[in-house]
Amino acid sequence: MIRVIFLDLDKTLLPEYDPEPAIPIVEELKKKGFEIVFNSSKTRAEQEYYREKLNVKGPFIVENGSAIYIPSNYFPFEVPGVKRGEYMVLELGVKVEEIRKALKELEAEYGLKYYGNSTDEEIEKFTKLPKHLIPLAKDREYSETIFLWKREGWEKDLIRKGFKVTMGSRFYAVHGNSDKGKAAKLLLDLYKRVDEVESYAVGDGENDFPMFDVVDFAFLIGDLRHENAENVTSIKDVLKKI
């Protein structure tokens, strides 16, 4: 039996941006025998930073389900995808260049601010990111993050152009027709080729809802509600239940 847990990062595993408080959580999950899979709106570069700090080695899902990064030779069979460095990458989203082209057409009309048209100083102000993490957040491949807008309607225009707009813990994300659930299910199907699987997911935002629909046990931090998820106050509560 393989036990897999999908973890959102912001406001779920990470109270803020410091990985230190998450170390005992990750260690406890390892002791319980879990395969830990980050499933976050964060970029590959950001997730690699936290993977290193937290010593997490398995696959991870980036930018709201836009791509799955699987370490080479992780599964005992060939994984379909694009070879990129030490990973096989299963791409489910669209390239960020396509998204930014659409945003460029709308930014003047709606006063949009996002990574692609913001300075490092503006990004620091919007996100409260530590300076050393800003380049990692800017290294986007499949999505953009909307920080500010001056009037409503931009979401509908982007949806009409074929993109998805989802709400995370802090900001709206713009990406292709991908979500955390589609990516999680695809990865679970690969695990099931190895052995029986028991699956879990923990998140705190609306963009986590799709992954709650594809796992056996789901936990929702905070006051939102989802029919397939049990509400908890923090990830520490989850450790007591699994």
Swiss-Prot record:
Its EC number is 3.1.3.70. Gene3D superfamilies: HAD superfamily/HAD-like (3.40.50.1000), Putative mannosyl-3-phosphoglycerate phosphatase, domain 2 (3.30.980.20). Its cofactor is Mg(2+). GO terms for molecular function: magnesium ion binding; mannosyl-3-phosphoglycerate phosphatase activity. Mg(2+) binds at residues 8, 10, 169, 204. It catalyses: 2-O-(alpha-D-mannosyl)-3-phosphoglycerate + H2O = (2R)-2-O-(alpha-D-mannosyl)-glycerate + phosphate. One of its GO terms (biological process) is mannosylglycerate biosynthetic process. The keyword Lipid biosynthesis does not apply. It holds the Pfam family Hydrolase_3. HAMAP family: MPGP_rel (MF_00617). Belongs to the HAD-like hydrolase superfamily. MPGP family. PANTHER family: HAD SUPERFAMILY HYDROLASE-LIKE, TYPE 3, PHOSPHOSERINE PHOSPHATASE. This is Mannosyl-3-phosphoglycerate phosphatase.
